[in-house]
Amino acid sequence: MTKPIITFNNVSKTFEDSGTQVLKNINFDLEEGKFYTLLGASGSGKSTILNIMAGLLDASSGDIYLDGERINDLPINKRDIHTVFQNYALFPHMTVFENVAFALKLKKVDKKEIAKRVKETLKMVQLEGFENRSIQKLSGGQRQRVAIARAIINQPRVVLLDEPLSALDLKLRTEMQYELRELQQRLGITFVFVTHDQEEALAMSDWIFVMNEGEIVQSGTPVDIYDEPINHFVANFIGESNIINGTMIEDYLVSFNGKEFESVDGGMRPNEPVEVVIRPEDLQITLPEEGKLQVKVDTQLFRGVHYEIIAYDELGNEWMIHSTRKAIEGEVIGLDFTPEDLHIMRLNETEEEFDARIEEYVEMDEPEDGLINAIEEERNEENL
């Protein structure tokens, strides 16, 4: 990892008036030029992290570093960090130009330089020709672009975005996801984005921190978070999941619904109770006799790109299936899946425990160098 631009070291926050602890020993390093997302439900602590980073709140304990320098006591205006708030915080009595140029005027930048940089920045956010437009006459998407332009015109090291897309309609929100991601990559500025929207986080991020009750419960790439949730909370919070109680018989063999199935997971105790995750899109509908499981269709909804089918097995477990095939309510269908479609979770495992287990298991499972060399020599002799 390169030198981090932002570091949180055992950062906690308790509001003294209520005694409520909203952050518990937060630790992370953020690299320069990446798109990070703090993802969690309301009250999870994600916006508190953003406010501490910006200097709007003080940490109760722990240390915050910017480029290796401790900034706990550094004033907001001395931090090379800019924030885009949920309500955009624009000046309604000013024009687009005046809003974007505001910070430069405070720094007493030359007027010609201000005009040049405002023009360049508005071009970046696709607002060329809007310089003299009143803020009150702009659409929600246009106001957001103005707020982003104002945040990036000084070319800060870090831009913080506190749920800036939440007030937009679905189509515009999707368009702005593409625009924000493309802008961040073009500028090479570190973006820290706060949202409760899982799809938004998966679509835009290089790295996601999943938060719950003031703690980071899992961090990783969007693919890691979606395909390898470490516990019930993450699996249930990120996308749709079928979560079934099971038993890990041995490495690569799991039992649930009274049957044994091959898997690609290992490193657990023999006969350890586990939870099995299968995503709805990984279930294939078959004839009942051809499926690994049989379920009875209860209800279905048409979601546009697929049907969302709810079915129940003979043990009463609910199954969600995403399929392009329309089902018939009351019919019995088969469900098929591959070993790769099963993700096995230990009960209540933390991210630290998960990482340690995987590291230990991989080391135990790797062949020794001497054995690898012997195999290669044997193959070479056979080819002579």
Curated annotation (Swiss-Prot):
ATP binds at G40, A41, S42, G43, S44, G45, K46, S47. It is a peripheral membrane protein. Its main location: membrane. Keywords: ATP-binding, Cell membrane, Membrane, Nucleotide-binding, Translocase, Transport. Residues 6-238 form the ABC transporter domain. Belongs to the ABC transporter superfamily. Spermidine/putrescine importer (TC 3.A.1.11.1) family. Part of the ABC transporter complex PotABCD involved in spermidine/putrescine import. Responsible for energy coupling to the transport system. This is Spermidine/putrescine import ATP-binding protein PotA. The gene is potA.
